C-alpha cells in the first residue's frame, strides 16, 4: 500500500497498537505460564488463547492491507473481514460438539474473539470513512470564506 493516505495510515496505527498489545500480553502470559503452569492453566489459559487468536487475525489483516493497491482495496478487505466474522457468528455452530472439552472451549473462545473482531473491524471501517483532518480544515475555511462573501 502506498504511503500518504491519512485514513489507511491512521487505521494501520491503531491496528499496530492492537497487535503490540496482544503480543505484549502473550509475552507476559507465557512468562507466567512457564513459572507455574498448573496455576496458569487454571486461571489464565483462556486469556493467552484469545491473545494468540486475536494477534493472528490482526497480523493477517496487516499483511492484506500492506499488499493492497489502493484505498478501495483496503476498504473491501475490512468489509470482507466484517462479513466473514458476522457470518461465522450468525450462521456458524454455537456448539462445537467435540468429544474434547478443550476443543469445545477453544471454539467458544473463538466466537468471543470474533465478536471483538467485528467491533474492531467496524472501528477500522469508520477510520477509513473519515474525512482527513487537512480536508476538514480546507472545507471549514471554504465555508468561512463563503459566509464572508455573502451579504448580510
What are these regions (language model features)?
Residues 1-4, 25-43, 92-98, 137-147:
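Extended non-catalytic scaffold regions that mediate assembly and binding
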Residues 1-17, 21, 67-77, 130-152:
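Long, compositionally biased, intrinsically disordered segments
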Residues 4-32, 54, 74-93:
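Short amphipathic alpha-helical heptad-repeat segments
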Residues 6-13, 41-52, 72, 108:
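Short, solvent-exposed segments of well-ordered alpha helices
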Residues 15, 22, 29, 44, ...:
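Amphipathic coiled-coil alpha-helices
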Residues 34, 42, 46, 56-106:
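Long, low-complexity or tandemly repetitive, helically biased scaffold regions used
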Residues 48-72, 110-130:
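Amphipathic alpha-helical coiled-coil segments
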Residues 86-148:
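Amphipathic alpha-helical binding modules
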Amino acid at each position: 500500500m502506498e504511503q500518504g493516505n491519512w485514513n489507511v495510515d491512521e487505521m494501520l496505527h491503531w491496528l499496530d497498537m492492537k497487535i503490540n498489545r496482544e503480543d505484549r500480553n502473550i509475552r507476559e502470559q507465557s512468562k507466567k505460564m512457564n513459572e507455574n503452569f498448573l496455576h496458569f492453566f487454571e486461571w489464565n489459559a483462556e486469556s493467552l488463547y484469545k491473545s494468540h487468536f486475536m494477534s493472528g487475525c490482526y497480523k493477517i489483516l496487516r499483511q492484506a492491507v500492506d499488499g493492497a493497491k489502493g484505498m478501495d482495496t483496503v476498504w473491501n478487505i475490512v468489509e470482507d473481514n466484517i462479513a466473514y466474522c458476522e457470518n461465522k457468528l450468525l450462521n456458524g455452530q454455537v456448539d462445537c460438539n467435540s468429544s474434547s472439552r478443550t476443543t469445545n472451549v477453544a471454539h467458544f473462545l473463538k466466537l468471543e474473539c470474533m465478536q471483538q473482531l467485528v467491533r474492531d473491524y467496524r472501528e477500522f471501517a469508520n477510520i477509513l470513512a473519515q474525512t482527513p483532518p487537512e480536508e476538514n480544515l480546507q472545507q471549514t475555511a471554504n465555508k468561512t470564506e463563503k459566509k464572508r462573501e455573502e451579504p448580510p
